[in-house]
Design a protein with these regions (language model features):
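Short, well-ordered beta-strand segments in beta-rich or mixed alpha/beta enzyme
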Residues: 6, 69-75, 108-138
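Generic marker of residues within folded, mature protein domains
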Residues: 62, 99, 112-113, 144-146
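Secondary-structure boundary/capping positions in well-ordered alpha/beta enzyme cores
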Residues: 106-107, 150
Length: 186
């Protein structure tokens, strides 16, 4: 993500703070869920990388009226290889749920383990591209704490639901050979 795209620090902290409060309310009402139907699926991307879904998060809400898919990627700053650092991050990442579930427009997230290049991805469904962009512009500040600055990227694909992307792999128009374009699911 270009630095010009991120929110200034104070508005980002305000947005993240409001999200945390909203998430707390949602957790108290038990409207946040961790279904297992996609856990273990291997997703392949147009850049040749693959990653396994290790967690899924959904919320109770009406179907998105303006669906879009958001893909976010980053590489952890101090963790390399396939060892305990990645396992620890995947375990601890559950705590990061409070940083996205309460944002307006959130529908669902697939959490993808690191690929062969050490890159993690989140594959989200969001209600409204503007809401997805607002979220990711605030998220930059949380990611920069643990990520290599130049590795933080995102792509919003409007007009499509996450499950449609999973079912109709490669249907993104125009076809793109990019890090975010899903080309296979197993």
């Amino acid at each position: 993500m270009r630095e010009s795209q991120r929110l200034p620090f104070r508005p980002a902290m305000a947005a993240l703070g409001l999200c945390i409060v909203t998430t707390g309310r949602m957790l108290a009402r038990r409207t946040v869920h961790l279904p297992r139907r996609n856990v273990g699926r291997r997703l392949s991307f147009a850049d040749g990388s693959t990653a396994v879904v290790y967690r899924e998060t959904t919320v109770d809400r009406d179907k998105a009226s303006d669906p879009c898919v958001l893909v976010v990627s980053f590489r952890l700053r101090w963790v390399r290889g396939w060892g305990w650092g990645h396992r620890l991050f995947r375990w601890e990442s559950m705590l990061n749920t409070v940083l996205f579930v309460g944002f307006p427009g959130f529908v669902s997230k697939l959490w993808l383990a690191h690929d062969r290049n050490g890159v993690y991805r989140g594959l989200y469904e969001w209600d409204g591209p503007a809401s997805a962009e607002a979220y990711v512009r605030a998220l930059w500040w949380a990611l920069i704490v643990v990520s290599e600055k130049d590795s933080i990227r995102h792509q919003v694909v409007p007009g499509i639901r996450r499950d449609a992307v999973l079912a109709g792999v490669g249907d993104v128009e125009p076809p793109a050979r990019e890090w975010w374009n899903l080309v296979g699911v197993s």
